């Protein structure tokens, strides 16, 4: 390998239990999510990795163990399934169903607000999930669009049930600092921090989500946090004129600042607007064959229950074989067009040298207001200004696919997804000289 390039094939892969872990799918301040493949069954999964020391230090063991055990027993079509739980000396691994249809938020960012019937359909699926988990004694406490993902068939699934308490608990400033950095979806009683009913608080968050789906913007959105808190606590908002009377009635009953008089899920299920086109979920809830022994083992201090993390060299294959054999790195995804909407991550190809690509990215990012830190063939960019969800931060890495072909991967590591969309549009415009236009190359070959 020359000094100016990195190979696309990693030096090693981490293997935990039966799972070989791949690239990072998402990253937060308390957990990282990685793509994984079960080497025995071939099944794909997502693995959420928690810091074991943080869990024990913040005395979250019993609550997490109880809620994860309950969630492992839940097999609902609108809830991301927990498959198994493992632990090493330093990490807790929660193996989750891989849902690869993208966030519901991305659909809004791409299309704008949804039509009322489509918004209602997603809202019905959200309420199905929340109602079922509440019936099992598990509350989400941090519902927002980032927790709502779509499967390949467009079915809504809710993620992070049973884990949100930990995400807030480990922050120094407590409840107000939710995973997205703002309290826009949080109920007034949660903001007041006087103790609250988890069911009523989740219903409020569902109401904010419904408003966003139908309006395309938040009902409560102020740059000044104190002003925002006051508006939320007084439920100061107005519905846009395109909302139907039925939708307005439901949203106003949900966004009721008093949790005692707020509409319950039982009442919501009887509402005429909600019932339009409603199809109750059909599924088997047979948990006789499901064991939670792995959850107990993961949170125990027994060394016998720990899995080992192994670094293994991958099977030797050329880069195009690697790309073609994995749905995560399909050629269709690899050579995506510039105009296509990006989500939390994207990649492009270039026939320029790695050093030239690095220089061009640095040169393009700085005028956009980003601080740039380089490390070999990785770049970390952080915005100077704080947006709706803190400073936007982006990680990039250059890989060599062939001597004259590189892949550049960009991933949002912090900040707002919509701001990342805007950043990528400007960033890719500045990089047009180094991005390989595969359509043009194909035309040249035909001639």
Swiss-Prot record:
Essential cofactor(s): Mn(2+)
Predominant location: cytoplasm
Region (PPI) residue spans: 343-372
EC code: 2.7.11.1
A Pfam cross-reference name: NAF
GO MF, any single term: protein serine/threonine kinase activity
InterPro entries reported in the protein's UniProt record: Kinase-like_dom_sf, NAF/FISL_domain, NAF_dom, Prot_kinase_dom, Protein_kinase_ATP_BS, Ser/Thr_kinase_AS
Keywords attached to this entry: ATP-binding, Cytoplasm, Kinase, Manganese, Nucleotide-binding, Nucleus, Phosphoprotein, Serine/threonine-protein kinase, Transferase
Catalytic activity field: L-seryl-[protein] + ATP = O-phospho-L-seryl-[protein] + ADP + H(+); L-threonyl-[protein] + ATP = O-phospho-L-threonyl-[protein] + ADP + H(+)
Residue list for modification Phosphoserine: 164
PROSITE patterns, per the entry: NAF, PROTEIN_KINASE_ATP, PROTEIN_KINASE_DOM, PROTEIN_KINASE_ST
Similarity remark: Belongs to the protein kinase superfamily. CAMK Ser/Thr protein kinase family. SNF1 subfamily.
Job of this protein: CIPK serine-threonine protein kinases interact with CBL proteins. Binding of a CBL protein to the regulatory NAF domain of CIPK protein lead to the activation of the kinase in a calcium-dependent manner. Involved in K(+) homeostasis under low-K(+) stress.
Subunit structure comment from the entry: Interacts with CBL2 and CBL3.
Name this polypeptide is given: CBL-interacting serine/threonine-protein kinase 9
The species this protein was found in: Arabidopsis thaliana (Mouse-ear cress)
């Amino acid at each position: 390998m020359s000094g100016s390039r990195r190979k696309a094939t990693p030096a090693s892969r981490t293997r935990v239990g039966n799972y070989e872990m791949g690239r990072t799918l998402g990253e937060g301040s308390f957990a990282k999510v990685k793509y994984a493949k079960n080497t025995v069954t071939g099944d794909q999964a997502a693995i959420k990795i928690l810091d074991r020391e943080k869990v024990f230090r913040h005395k979250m063991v019993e609550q997490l163990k109880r809620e994860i055990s309950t969630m492992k027993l839940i097999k609902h079509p609108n809830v991301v399934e927990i498959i198994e739980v493992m632990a090493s000396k330093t990490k807790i691994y929660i193996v989750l169903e891989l849902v690869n249809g993208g966030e519901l938020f991305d659909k809004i960012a791409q299309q704008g607000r949804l039509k009322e019937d489509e918004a209602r359909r997603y809202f019905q699926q959200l309420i199905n999930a929340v109602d079922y988990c509440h019936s099992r004694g598990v509350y989400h406490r941090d519902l927002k669009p980032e927790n709502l993902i779509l499967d390949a068939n467009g079915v809504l699934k809710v993620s992070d049930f049973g884990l949100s308490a930990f995400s807030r608990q480990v922050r120094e400033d407590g409840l107000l600092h939710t995973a997205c950095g703002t309290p826009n979806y949080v109920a007034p009683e949660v903001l007041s921090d006087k103790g609250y009913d988890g069911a009523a608080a989740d219903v409020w968050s569902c109401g904010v989500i419904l408003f966003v789906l139908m309006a395309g913007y938040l009902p409560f959105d102020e740059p000044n946090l104190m002003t925002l808190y006051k508006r939320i606590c007084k439920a100061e908002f107005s519905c846009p004129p395109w909302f139907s009377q039925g939708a307005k009635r439901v949203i106003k009953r949900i966004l009721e600042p008093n949790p005692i008089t707020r509409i319950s899920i039982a009442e919501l299920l009887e509402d005429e607007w909600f019932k339009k086109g409603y199809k109750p979920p059909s599924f088997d809830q047979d948990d006789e064959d499901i064991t939670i022994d792995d959850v107990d083992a993961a949170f125990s201090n027994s060394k016998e229950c720990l899995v080992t993390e192994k670094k293994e060299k991958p099977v030797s294959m050329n880069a195009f074989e690697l790309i073609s054999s994995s749905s995560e790195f399909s050629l269709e995804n690899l050579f995506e067009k510039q105009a296509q909407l990006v989500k939390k991550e994207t990649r492009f190809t270039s026939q320029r040298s790695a050093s030239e690509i690095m220089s061009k990215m640095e040169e393009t990012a700085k005028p956009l207001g980003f601080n740039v830190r380089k490390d070999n063939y990785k770049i970390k960019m952080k915005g100077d200004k704080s947006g709706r969800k803190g400073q936007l931060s982006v990680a990039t890495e250059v890989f060599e696919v062939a001597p004259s072909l590189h892949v550049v991967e960009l991933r949002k590591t912090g900040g707002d997804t919509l701001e990342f969309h805007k950043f990528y549009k400007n960033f890719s415009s500045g990089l047009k000289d180094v991005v390989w236009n595969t359509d043009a190359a194909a035309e040249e070959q035909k001639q």
